[in-house]
Amino acid sequence: MSATYNFCAGPAMLPQAVMEKAQSELLDWNGLGTSVMEISHRSKEFIALTEQAEIDLRELMSIPSNYHVLFMHGGGRGQFSAVVNNFLGNNGKALYLVDGSWSSAAVDEAKKLAGETQIDTLNIVEKDGATSRVSIPNLKELDQDYRYLHYCPNETVDGIEIFEELDSPWPIVADMSSNIMSREIDVSRYGLIYAGAQKNIGPSGLSIVIVKDELLQLPQLPQSSIMDYRLGVKHGSMYNTPPTFAWYLAAEVFKWLKSSGGVGEVQKANERKAGTLYQFIDSCDFYENRVAVENRSVMNVTFYLKDEALNDEFIKQAKAVGLVALKGHRSVGGMRASIYNAMPLEGVEKLVEFMTDFANKNRA
């Protein structure tokens, strides 16, 4: 059977080696005669798994010792609520930078919980014709006392990525659901990083939270216990039963990342994949990208057929040759190739080959 390359924005493809290992030990994990899905989350075997997973994640991201790592329920949207409830209190204010669909969704959730007056927003995307470009003002010139600044450095729907480290006078909260461990970052510049697992970490149902200890002293709003960071830290992410199979797969992905040379080597591979695809799009008059070069996402490459009447045929023919989930988000249309860490270069090369052939056959 020929290879199928899954370009879904999430849940996304997992590394082949991880999938094969999970398959091989699905019914008998660690010599226990049972699946990892069937054992107690408080068993010594599973505790050992979770401890090693945290060690590996800390090593991969160079997480300082004054940061806690939580493995939580809820995905990214769950963290939209958790951030507000854990940090804002009754009288605090927060600033949200808006650069696309997911940062907008975070704003909506924050305003629902805290009210309009506690949440300020700043749109940082400018339009130059059809091209989107990020423009971030000098944040230190804003005369406000915010509990935190929230932003999403990679917008999957819009294909926009912010590569610069923000210079913020307030603690930075970053939604890295779609670009965590895709490139090296300085964790110490952030107050909190959260990420839904289903793009670069594992299957859906799990979220990772990396939080600086001092932020846990901020006033809280009433909230559910399972989304309380303080309780999560106190109970080692096991105040309630965690999503154990997702945690297990995340642990295997961390091992795979280490065996691949770590985040630095994965970053080089990601840049090569994205560069291959963007270079082709820019050189072909049949397709176009609508994001400024300096803000083009390495993880989510959006592109448009100049004759959009061919969209359905493009998707149909791509699927027939093993290139699936290329349809763009319904809110923006076009196409989207999500090329997260697990996507091999061969998948991108096959996509470019198909796009070349499709363009040659369908030019007017």
From Swiss-Prot:
Pathway: Amino-acid biosynthesis; L-serine biosynthesis; L-serine from 3-phospho-D-glycerate: step 2/3; Cofactor biosynthesis; pyridoxine 5'-phosphate biosynthesis; pyridoxine 5'-phosphate from D-erythrose 4-phosphate: step 3/5. One of its GO terms (cellular component) is cytoplasm. The keyword ATP-binding does not apply. Its EC number is 2.6.1.52. Binds 1 pyridoxal phosphate per subunit. Pyridoxal 5'-phosphate binds at residues 76-77, 102, 156, 175, 198, 240-241. Keywords: Amino-acid biosynthesis, Aminotransferase, Cytoplasm, Pyridoxal phosphate, Pyridoxine biosynthesis, Serine biosynthesis, Transferase. GO terms for molecular function: O-phospho-L-serine:2-oxoglutarate aminotransferase activity; pyridoxal phosphate binding. L-glutamate binds at residue 42. The keyword Endoplasmic reticulum does not apply. Homodimer. Catalyzes the reversible conversion of 3-phosphohydroxypyruvate to phosphoserine and of 3-hydroxy-2-oxo-4-phosphonooxybutanoate to phosphohydroxythreonine. PANTHER family: PHOSPHOSERINE AMINOTRANSFERASE. Belongs to the class-V pyridoxal-phosphate-dependent aminotransferase family. SerC subfamily. This is Phosphoserine aminotransferase. It comes from Shewanella woodyi (strain ATCC 51908 / MS32). The gene is serC.
